[in-house]
A protein has these predicted regions:
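PLP-dependent aminotransferase-like
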Residues: 86, 105-165, 178
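A short helix->loop->beta-strand "cap" motif at the edges of active sites that frequently abuts
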Residues: 112, 133, 190-194, 221-222
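N-terminal small-domain helix-loop-helix segment of the aminotransferase-like
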Residues: 2-95, 102, 278-279, 386-387
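Helix C-cap/helix->beta junction micro-motif
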Residues: 26, 131, 190-191, 305, ...
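Active-site phosphate-binding strand-loop segment of PLP-dependent enzymes
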Residues: 140-207
Length: 387
């Protein structure tokens, strides 16, 4: 038989989803894959129940149902501080993941260099490789996960076509400051580089910090694609509804790839999601307070147990240092498998997020009910005995 594609020789299956499968097999509390165990807003579920009987149930307009795009334009226009045209500057996608893939194909050609900040969400490397591009890594330096502007400029100077930035950052929990984003923006403009922003955690930010949208920085609207989803903000990770926002000339290209990749998003889910997108602004305050509450429970519990970790500025992830618990020669992948099977807690090995050789970090998440978090902390409290 003829040879199959060589592209996926350079990446494996998702470590995050693999850890979910292991957690499910052994009944572990899944703090690996980032999804909540509480319901979406009742208003959205009530609307979905009505839509299940009344429709729509057939193909939508490829770019997304008009009322869905209009609701995105209103909501995002408010937070981004600009008018967004739902007819020419938005496309609905199968989660932010599809938005990122479509964007890479729309902006790059085979062999182009794409800058990524390490640590990074594991999907990015695979997506860049699938687009036949070359990933170029610039480290974020713990514990603040700041970057060296000179190192970033060196990466740009080498001929970068685009940079991928997750803000707030999965897995580090970093929230990029306006000054940091302006530094990146200056380099993007100077070296003619596109900014591909993954902003799915835009409303999960702590301690009075502010999410700054890259496309709001002067000179960046023309070269920025903002990818996001409803998954985190409305606790509907299984609905797989996302979107991209970009200027018309870029959006026209993204829509072409979306059309042939996905045809469209689920019609009944878009209809029900409009209710969420039209929530009053108070919803986002309450949403943020809920996540601050969950963060407090989990981080205080981790401190009491004595497990070192990074305190996130945003997102619902912590990076924990497992150095005290690693056996000699043990990999972080094996540690996480044993943690799920013996301690009953699912985690993600940090090596799947870093380009640098990291073996002592795992990612945990706290988007869970109070009782789930307390149960997980109780199990982690016995980690020394179980491991």
């Amino acid at each position: 038989m003829q040879e199959m594609s060589r592209r996926n020789q350079h990446f494996t299956d998702s470590v995050i989803r693999r850890m979910t499968r292991i957690s499910n097999e052994c009944g572990a509390i899944n703090l690996a894959q980032g999804f909540p165990d509480f319901d979406p807003p009742k208003e959205m579920m009530d609307r979905l129940e009505v839509v299940s009987h009344e429709g729509p149930h057939q193909y939508p307009i490829t770019m997304g149902a008009p009322n869905f795009r209009q609701a995105i334009a209103r909501k995002c226009g408010h937070f981004m501080g600009r008018t967004i045209d739902p007819e020419t500057e938005i496309v609905a996608t199968i989660g932010s993941t599809e938005a990122m893939v479509d964007t890479l194909f729309a902006l790059t050609n085979p062999g182009d260099r794409v800058v990524m900040l390490s640590p990074f969400f594991e999907n990015y490397r695979a997506q860049v490789i699938m687009a036949d591009c070359e990933p170029v890594f610039v480290p974020l330096n713990p514990p603040t996960f700041s970057f060296d502007p000179n190192a970033l400029e060196d990466a740009f100077r080498g001929g970068a076509k685009a940079i991928i930035i997750c803000n707030p950052s999965n897995p580090s929990g970093k929230v990029f400051t306006e000054e940091e984003l302006k530094t990146i923006a200056d380099l993007c403009i100077r070296y003619d580089v596109y900014a591909i922003m993954d902003e799915v955690y835009e409303h999960i930010i702590y301690d009075g910090r502010k999410h700054v949208y890259m496309n709001s920085i002067p000179g960046m609207w023309e070269r920025t694609v903002s990818c996001s989803s409803l998954s985190k903000t409305y606790s509907v990770t299984g609905w797989r509804l996302g979107y991209a926002i970009a200027p018309e000339n870029i959006m026209a290209r993204i829509r072409q790839y979306h059309d042939f990749n996905a045809v469209g998003c689920p019609s009944p889910l878009m209809e029900a999601a409009v209710v969420g997108l039209n929530m009053p602004l108070s919803y986002y305050d309450e949403f943020g307070a809920h996540y601050a509450h969950m963060k407090k429970i989990f981080t205080e519990g981790m401190r009491d147990i004595g497990i070192p970790f990074t305190d996130p500025e945003g997102t619902y992830f912590v990076l924990a240092d497992i150095s005290p618990y690693l056996k000699k020669g043990q990999s972080d992948v094996d540690f996480c498998e044993q943690l799920a099977r013996k301690a009953g807690v699912g985690a993600v090995p940090g090596s799947s997020f870093f380009n640098e050789p990291i073996n002592n970090i795992v990612r945990l998440h706290f988007a869970k009910k109070d009782e789930t978090l307390y149960a997980a902390l109780d199990r982690l409290n016995h980690i020394k005995d179980m491991m």
